[in-house]
Amino acid sequence: MPFRETSPVAERIALMREFETGVFSVTELCCRHGISRETFYVWQPRWVSGEERWFEERSHAVACCPHATDGRLAERIIAVRRRFVHFGPKKIKAWLEDESRRKGDGTGWPAASTIGDILKRAGLVEPQRKRRRAIAQGEVVAPAHAPNEEWSIDFKGWFRTSDGTRCDPLTITDQASRFLVEVRIVDPTWAGVRYALERVFDDIGMPAAIRSDNGTPFGSTGAGGLSALSVWWLKLGIEPRYIPPSSPQDNGRHERMHRTLKAETSKPPARSAAEQQQRFDGFRRHYNEDRPHEALGQKAPAQLWQPPARTFPAGRLGDPWYDADHKVRRVRPAGQIKWRGEEVFIGEALAGELVGVAEHDSGGHIVRFSNRDLGVIGRDRRFLRFAPPRARLRVASEAPVTVEQ
């Protein structure tokens, strides 16, 4: 004999029909059906009321929630998300609170978690693949603590616009404030980058240091890691700082900005380079003025950044100054200097520049450009780049310096 199949609805109907006969007491009915008296008195009034579908489960949700988000606030949250499609709940909350402060309307906005729930219900949140964190390796460059203490510079990976034009976006950010100083399509050569930097320096001023990778045109494998571009930085009094090779995590703030730049301006690319540059200009304004950053206390970069105090010098740059105990040599066009009757190769990036040569405790001679040590000329007259740690140079009294061509 097969088992009798039943359901909660069928059991409720049978319970009330048996109760209607008057044969069983309430206690007996509850024992027969395996329910409590409290459950019986939940269903009995519904059966008596004559409701058409009294036997169905009802929603247990509260009829009214006094702390539910006002519909107008939810609509405003959704509108901000549609305007800034890459803003998450925290940025939306910060942006709305800043807007309320400017207007002085005193609106209280819900928590970021509630905003996230509102966006999910509106179908505005897509599940994202979790990114595996990279393991940091090597020496990490110390972070900047004040605006213009250090800028970061790099090229965002090149791509082509719809008409086939190649775009190489040069990006510059301030490390401390995250301020996006420039996004400009330039020729990826030292001359192209120098021209773009001259415009920036002349417009807003210069930082104390610039952080970059050691690739062309920012650095090289030559003496001191210098390139023609970083030699120019040193002459301007800007310290070149290089992250270790294959260590983009040491420039993580800049790389994170690149992800946002790509998502909001080049997916898909514009029709032409001119139109793409317009997108970059619009993104720069939005990134600096509208987009809150969690690391900045949900403030926009423009609220923290201020123009540099150092101005771009006009006219020809002067040669570096060296202590009196240095022999000064002019680097020839092919990268050599004349040292004790022989030509010693230093580096083509320094062609035409003055370098200083001073005695070293090891018996050799240390070579430097400005305040950057380049290497050591050994007793065999060979130049060794990136020499081992060395003793501090002796500081002599100031005296006239002669230049040997």
Which ranges hold each PLM region?
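Mobile-element integrase/transposase regions
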Residues: 68, 113, 117-174, 179, ...
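Charged alpha-helix within mobile-element recombinases
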Residues: 222, 228-314, 356, 360-361
